[in-house]
C-alpha cells in the first residue's frame, strides 16, 4: 500500500513538472511573438493619425480590465484550485493569453486600416505589398501557433483535472491507511498487555515448579542416601553371609575328612593290632611306643588326605548344593557324601601296604625298633608331602583368584554324584590333577616373573608375565613361537615388537617397551617403579572415576593403559588414541597425571592423603571428583552438584591449574550468569579453600629445582622410523616415570595385578635382603620351580 502511494505521488510530481515545462515553453513562444509584433508595429507608416492610435489604445486599455475580470471569473467557475502555486500560474497564463489576444486584435485593426489605405491610394509600392503579404503569412502562422497553444492549454487543464482526481483518491487511501495503522496499533497494545500478563503468570508457575523441584530434589537425595545406606547394609550382610558360608564349607570339609579318617582307622584297626601284639614281650609289656607311633601316623594320614585331595574337595564343596537345617547347620547332600569312599582309597594304601609288609617279613627287622624307625621315615615323607601339597593348595587358591575372578558360581549337576562314581574314575581324576598342575606351574611362573630378573626368565615365565601381569594374552601365540627367554625380550626393539610379536597397536608397543625398560632398570638394583603397581583396571575404573571422566573408561581398557603408560601420555596421545577431544578434559587428565608424578605414582600415599581429608576441607590437591561434589553440597549448592559427574573437575585441576577460577567452576556447575549472589558465594568459598593449597604448593616446588636427566643408553636407538613417536614419548617421560637411578630409592618389588596380590611363601630371604639387592638374591626353593 505504501509503495503504491509513493509511486502515485511520483507520477503526480512528474506530471506537474511536465505541465510547468509546457507553460514555460508557451511563455517563451508568447514572448517571441510579442517581439515580432513589436517589430511589426515599428514598420507602420508615420503618417497615421495620432488620434486614431490614441483611441485604439484607450479602447484597448478600457477593454483589458474587463477581459481580465472575465478571465478570472471563468477561472473561478471552472473548479477548485489545487494549490496556491497552481492558481497563480493559471492566472498568469490567462493574462498572457489576454494580452496576446489584445495584440492580435490591434494587429487586425492595423491590417484593416492598412488595407483601407491601400484601397484609397489605389495602389502602393510593391515593396509595401510584399511586406503586407509577409505580414499576412506571419499573422497566419501566429494564429496557428496560438491555436496550438490553446490546444496545449486545454490538454494541460485536462491533465490537471485528472491529477486532481488522482490526488483525491490518494488522500482517501492515506486516510484508510491511517485508520488501518491505528487499528493495528491498538491490536499490538492489546497483545503486549496480554503477553505481559501471561509472562507474569508463567513466572509465578515457574516459581511454584522450582519450589516443587527443590522438594523433589530433597526427597531424591533422601532416597539416594537411604538407598546407599541400604546398599551398604546389604553389602555388609552379603559379606557376613559369604563368611558364614565359607566357614560352613570349611566345617563340612573337616566333617568329611573326619568321616574318611574314621572309616580308614576303623578299617585298619585289626591289622594294626596284629602288628602290635608281638612287640609287647620285647618291651616288657609296655605298649606306649605303639600308641605314640600310631597317633602321629593317624595325623599324617589325615594331613596327606587333606593335601592330596584338597583341590578336588574344594571344587566339589563349592559346586555342591548345601541344605541348611533348622539350627543353621549346613549339611552335605547325599550326592556329595557318596564321593567320600573314593577319597579314602589312596589314604588306606599306605597302612595296608605297611601291614602286608609286616606280615610277610619274618626277619629281625620286624622288631619294634625297626618298625618305629620305618614309621618315623614314613612320617617324614608324609610331612614333606604335606608341605608340598600345602604350597600347591595355596597356589591353587591364588590361581583361582587370578583366572576365576568374576565367574559366577554354578551348582554342580547332581548326575555327577550318581552311583556310577564317574567323578572318581581314574581318567577324570587324572584330567583334574593335570589341570591343577598346569595352573600351579603357571602360578609359579608368574611368581618367578615378579621376583626374578628378566634376564633369567625362560619361555614359560615370559608367557605367564605377558598373559597375567601385562594382560596381553592376545600376543601369547607369537610370543611362544619367537621369544624363548627373558634375554631375547630385553634385546627386542620397537620394530621387533611389531614384527615378531605382531603388536600393531602403538599404545600396546609403548606399554610393553616401558615395562621392559622398567625391568632393565630394576636389574641395576633399584627395583621396579611404583607405576608398575598400577594396572590398567585401576587406571580405567578407579582413577578415571576419581578425576571425573568415567566416560573414557572403554578407550583406556582397549589400549590397556597402566601406570607406566599413563605417565607417558601427552595431549596428542589423548586426542589421537583415547578419543579425548575436549581441551578441558585433556587438561584434567594431564593434571591428574602430574599429581601422580608428584606422588611418585605411590597409590598408598595417595589413598592415605585422601582418607585424611575425607571429612576435612584440607589438602584439596588430592580430592577426587566425588569429594568435590561432597564439598559443593556442604556449601549449600547441592542443586548444582550433580553437574560435575562427568566434567573432569578434581582437586589437581583446582590447585595446579592457575587459570581455574570461580567462574570456571561456576560454568562447570551450570550456574546461570544472572545469579550473582550464588557465584559470589562460590568465589569466596573457593578462595578460602584453594589459596592456601596453592601457596603451600609454590613453597614445595621452589626448593625442588630441575629434575635429573637420564643419560643411559637405551635399546630404543635401533628401532624403525615407524615407531618414532613411541621412542620420543619414552625418552620424554622416563624421568617422570621414575626410571632414573636417582629416583628409584626405596621401591617395592611387589606388584598389584588385576587379581590382587598373590601369596608368597619362602620369600623371607628376599624381603630381608631387598635393601642391598632387591632382585638378585633368591632362595633355592624359588629357583627350583623354574
UniProtKB/Swiss-Prot annotation:
Compositional bias (Low complexity): 52-62
Coiled-coil regions listed in the entry: 92-270
Gene3D superfamilies: 1.10.287.1490, Transcription Factor, Ets-1 (1.10.150.50)
Domain SAM positions: 457-522, 535-599, 623-686
Family affiliation: Belongs to the kazrin family.
Tagged with keyword Coiled coil: yes
Name of the protein this chain belongs to: Kazrin-A
Organism: Danio rerio (Zebrafish)
InterPro entries membership: Kazrin, Kazrin_SAM_rpt_2, Kazrin_SAM_rpt_3, SAM, SAM/pointed_sf
Alphabetically ordered keywords of this record: Coiled coil, Repeat
Composition skew (Polar residues), residue ranges: 742-758
Disordered: annotated segments: 44-70, 350-425, 703-760
